[in-house]
């Protein structure tokens, strides 16, 4: 982190304050050429900055004691911030840490496609927001993010929060079950390996995203790629449900699980079935090739 920038909004989404401060790098003191071209400053300006721990304490004080929630453009800002907090042995944020990923919310509401992750500049231009300061400066980007947020439809905002995964549950009692209108999410404690994780009933069982009824699987769990498994079940009240398990590595070599369950269409079900058949055929061909070689 080489800069912290933020814009504060009140409960009616009015801009009431701004914060910005340059941070003097402690480990990586030279910018990569690609990053230097992107930013609006260089190493000479960074050398005038203050240490991260000093700036962060000032930033936390600026945030205030009242309850607040972070709004970011993409999920990585909080990850980088917490990595630096750990480096300086600073107190963690409250757990679990909820935030609004405005990039994702914008993609869902305005592009109707969660898989598209538009740049902040594209969103600003698409919303006809006046551009009067350079992008890729933390304080300016925070201001533009606030302006985009002001113009968004906030009718379903309470349901559109995300949970930061940098810190995961330390025990079963801390595991997180988060229910939303169109999906549910379950975040587990750490397991020794993927096999142990999938043996846990809270992970392997599939429950309806809406009524939480245990479902019979029409497609059993299968490995979609190295870190993802998928299954499909059917609720007689709420239709087809797709379960997806993502494995996240911990610092000590273990894994924790992020499981999501969403409603899907029959067409999406057929696509998943085709994917399972495709992977099964590839494995069969691979086994046959090994047999012919031996």
What residue ranges belong to the model's regions?
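Acidic two-metal-ion nuclease catalytic site recognized across multiple nuclease folds
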Residues: 151-294
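Short alpha-helix plus adjacent loop in nuclease-associated cores
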Residues: 100-115
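Acidic, Mg2+-coordinating catalytic module of metal-dependent nucleases/exonucleases
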Residues: 69-76, 80-84, 118-182
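Substrate-recognition/cap helix-loop segment adjacent to the acidic, metal-dependent catalytic center
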Residues: 79-97
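Conserved non-catalytic scaffold segment of RNase H-like nuclease domains
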Residues: 1-79, 243-285
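Short, polar/flexible loop-turn hinges at active-site or ligand-entry regions and domain interfaces
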Residues: 41-48, 91-93, 130-133
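N-terminal globular core domains of eukaryotic regulatory proteins
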Residues: 42-44, 104, 122-125
């Amino acid at each position: 982190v080489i800069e912290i920038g933020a814009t504060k909004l009140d409960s009616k989404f009015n801009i009431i304050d701004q914060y910005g401060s340059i941070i003097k790098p402690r480990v990586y003191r030279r910018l990569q050429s690609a990053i230097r071209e992107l930013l609006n400053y260089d190493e000479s300006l960074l050398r005038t900055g203050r240490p991260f721990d000093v700036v962060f304490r000032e930033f936390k004080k600026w945030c205030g004691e009242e309850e607040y929630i972070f709004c970011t453009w993409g999920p990585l800002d909080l990850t980088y911030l917490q990595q630096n907090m750990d480096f300086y042995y600073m107190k963690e944020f409250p757990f679990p840490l909820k935030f609004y990923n405005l990039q994702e919310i914008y993609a869902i509401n305005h592009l109707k496609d969660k898989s598209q992750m538009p740049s902040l500049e594209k969103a600003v231009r698409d919303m006809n927001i006046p551009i009067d300061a350079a992008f890729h400066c933390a304080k300016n980007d925070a201001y533009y993010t606030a302006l985009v947020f002001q113009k968004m439809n906030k009718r379903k905002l309470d349901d559109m929060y995300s949970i930061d995964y940098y810190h995961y549950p330390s025990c079963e009692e801390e595991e997180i079950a988060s229910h939303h209108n169109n999906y549910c999410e379950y975040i587990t404690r750490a397991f020794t390996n993927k096999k142990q994780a999938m043996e846990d009933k809270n992970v392997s069982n599939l429950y309806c995203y809406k009524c939480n009824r245990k479902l019979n699987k029409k497609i059993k769990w299968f490995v979609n790629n190295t870190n993802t498994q998928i299954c499909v079940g059917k609720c007689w009240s709420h239709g087809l449900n797709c379960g997806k398990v993502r494995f996240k590595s911990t610092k000590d070599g273990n894994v924790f699980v992020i499981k999501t369950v969403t409603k899907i269409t029959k067409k999406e079900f057929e696509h998943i079935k085709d994917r399972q058949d495709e992977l099964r055929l590839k494995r069969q061909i691979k086994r046959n090739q090994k047999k012919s070689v031996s």
